[in-house]
Amino acid sequence: GIKIAYPSNGADLKGLLKAAYYDPNPVVILEHKGLYWSKVKGTDAARVNEPSEDYILPFGKANIVQEIWEQETNETITVITYGMGVHWALNASTTMKNQVEIIDLRTLYPIDEEAIFKSVKKAKKCLVVTEEPTNNSFARSLAGLIQEICFKYLDAPVMVIGSENMPAIPLNSTLEFTMIPNADKVRLKMEELLEY
């Protein structure tokens, strides 16, 4: 019965916290410290107006942050992410907004499979963005599920971008920057997938 949430902005955090309060089962809410006061460059989208006092966000309901229409002539992709990955994807897609649909999962369990599969079938290509090392990760598992369910709709393999597979985050800031994804790395992966 455990639920896992990972919001990308303060409004979602408030709604998920209230949902956790009313849920009879255990809930784990993860949050990225870089999103506090939007102090990391490129996270301006995390600054949102506080929702009403009664705002509750249901578990298992993803948010389409950037939507595209089905296109026959252009290559398109769906980016599935959560937390800080939402902001990397938004910043990475500034020059290709009409080709990139971005889905913020909000909750990792339960997961909104319906929204994911619908978007992937429309875009025909998928990139899963995470901050965790990709070996044996949630993102790899999700990519495998998408590949299995949406295989006949895909024009390319489902790709994953995450941290380098190292045992820990280095203390050296240069090494840390090298290890962790950012908007530039995500943009390069998007371009690679669009050209596939």
Give, region by region, the residue ranges found by the protein language model:
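Thiamine diphosphate
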Residues: 33-196
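Conserved thiamine diphosphate
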Residues: 1-23, 163, 194
